[in-house]
Amino acid sequence: MPIKKIISRSNSGIHHSTVIDYKKLLTTNKNKPEKSLLVTLKKHGGRNNQGKITVRHQGGRNKRKYRIIDFKRTHYDNIEATVKSIEYDPNRSCFVSLITYANGAKSYIISPDGIKVGDKILASEHPIDIKPGFSMPLAFIPEGTQVHNIELHPKGGGQIARSAGSYARILGQDETGKYVILQLLSGETRKFLKECRATVGVVSNLDHNLVVIGKAGRNRHRGIRPTVRGSAMNPNDHPHGGGEGRSPVGRDAPRTPWGKRHMGVKTRNMKKASTNLIIRNRKGEQY
């Protein structure tokens, strides 16, 4: 199992921490990614161009370089590619695979579980083999197949099931033959246009959810700052703030920092066009 416990008794946080043993999973030195596919990332600390906080709990992370990931897989259709390496990516929970096409082009893709260096993969708009890493339209993938990196719109690039260990299962086509029905890992059942592409297999790094962070410093290294309770703030900072001592919320329901109803209250706009594509939500309720 690639989860490794940190053997140290210097403090209680480290004593209970676990990490992923990347030496068993990766095939290349993490300090040597493909330079032609790297972009420098500027840190914003959750601030906008006015210096105001727009995303809370961000700031102070380690420096990163962004790996340009090919989510579309349409640039080199029907050209066989070879997996050259499986690498760590600090910008996502899964691993990425560096592939080289027969014409010499290189690109990064989300690494499926079970793929190895030297494996051949292919992307096509026509029916091809059902193997991990092969990309094709949903119309050509049989029922029961696990897929990831699923497009919401044809040729728009994969947007669904891209994080570690995630996938969706194909349930079949609808009665019109225009859509393919997928069950997402959240439990939601949804329709996708059959022209949308998906990649066969489950996303790599299945044990990501088993990692125990253990101490605050590891999250600070990742750029995650502390989360403060609203009831501990002043009334001008949060709807729950103020009062003498530990005061109750004082409202009919808990609120977000922006005054919106929170915890168990449905906030989805049912007039969105995509509502018609959802068959059952993640709670199993019929739409």
Swiss-Prot record:
Alphabetically ordered keywords of this record: Ribonucleoprotein, Ribosomal protein, RNA-binding, rRNA-binding
Statement: the UniProt record of this protein carries the keyword rRNA-binding: yes
One cellular component (GO) term of this entry: large ribosomal subunit
GO biological process: cytoplasmic translation
Record flagged with keyword rRNA-binding: yes
InterPro entries with a match to the protein in the record: NA-bd_OB-fold (IPR012340), Rib_uL2_dom2 (IPR014722), Ribosomal_uL2 (IPR002171), Ribosomal_uL2_bac/org-type (IPR005880), Ribosomal_uL2_C (IPR022669), Ribosomal_uL2_CS (IPR022671), Ribosomal_uL2_dom3 (IPR014726), Ribosomal_uL2_RNA-bd_dom (IPR022666)
Region (Disordered), start-end ranges: 222-266
Superkingdom, natural source: Bacteria
Single annotated GO MF: transferase activity
One Pfam family named in its UniProt record: Ribosomal_L2
PANTHER family cross-referenced by the UniProt entry: LARGE RIBOSOMAL SUBUNIT PROTEIN UL2M, RIBOSOMAL PROTEIN L2
Family of the protein in this entry: Belongs to the universal ribosomal protein uL2 family.
Function recorded in the entry: One of the primary rRNA binding proteins. Required for association of the 30S and 50S subunits to form the 70S ribosome, for tRNA binding and peptide bond formation. It has been suggested to have peptidyltransferase activity; this is somewhat controversial. Makes several contacts with the 16S rRNA in the 70S ribosome.
Subunit and interaction comment: Part of the 50S ribosomal subunit. Forms a bridge to the 30S subunit in the 70S ribosome.
Name of protein: Large ribosomal subunit protein uL2
Gene that encodes it: rplB
